[in-house]
Design a protein with these regions (language model features):
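Terminal-region recognition feature
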Residues: 1-200
Length: 200
């Protein structure tokens, strides 16, 4: 996330510049995930999720996701945090949720997974590469297959599709409109305005 907007706020009687994302984090329990998912992105998202879970009994946290994909292991870290925090987690796709981004969209609390009207969602099989000795490559390929099966099983759990269907659809890039993502079970509704009003 390159440019971070700042706003002036009166804190303890003095005007201070505050990151808009930090302000939204505390005021509206909102987290933003933008760009490819890596270990740094995951660390921030997980820390914010647990922080919000600890400081308040508020029943919901919102994660806005605009993501082309990224590291599977980093994505799993965010996924586990979403599943483990006490509050419900509403995931909102803004722009694009592809690959691991789509996985995180689907991982939100059932009934609270939202896509904005012009969003695009894409699932596919994980990509990976291997090199070295043949035996090591065979070990790595088997590991990649296990990862693929685990992702398919998890997507099946969250979408209501069969693992066989998920496997078939994700063999190649499978793009969906907002309407198609809802029909597929990756999201529950197309509704941006109502989600913002819920914070007020």
């Amino acid at each position: 996330m390159g440019l971070v907007p700042h706003v002036a706020e009166n804190i303890n009687g003095s005007d201070q510049m505050t990151s808009l994302f930090d302000r939204e984090l505390v005021k509206n329990r909102t987290i933003y995930i933008s760009g490819p998912i890596d270990s740094a992105t995951a660390l921030l998202a997980v820390a914010k999720l647990y922080y919000l879970s600890d400081i308040s009994d508020d029943p919901i946290t919102i994660i806005f996701v605009d993501c082309p994909g990224g590291s599977v292991t980093a994505g799993w870290a965010i996924y586990d945090a979403i599943q483990n925090v006490a509050c419900e987690v509403s995931t909102v796709c803004m722009g694009m949720c592809a690959s691991m981004g789509a996985f995180l969209l689907a991982s939100g609390t059932k009934g609270k997974r939202i896509v904005t009207p012009n969003s695009e969602v894409m699932i596919h099989q994980p990509s990976a590469g291997t090199q070295g000795m043949v035996t090591d490559m065979e070990i790595n390929i088997e590991h990649f297959q296990r990862v693929k099966r685990r992702i398919n099983a998890t997507l099946a759990k969250h979408t209501g599709k069969s693992e066989k269907q998920i496997k078939k659809d994700s063999e190649r890039d499978h793009w969906m409109s907002a309407e198609e993502a809802v029909a597929y079970g990756l999201a529950d509704e197309i509704d941006y305005g109502a989600q913002r009003r819920e914070c007020d």
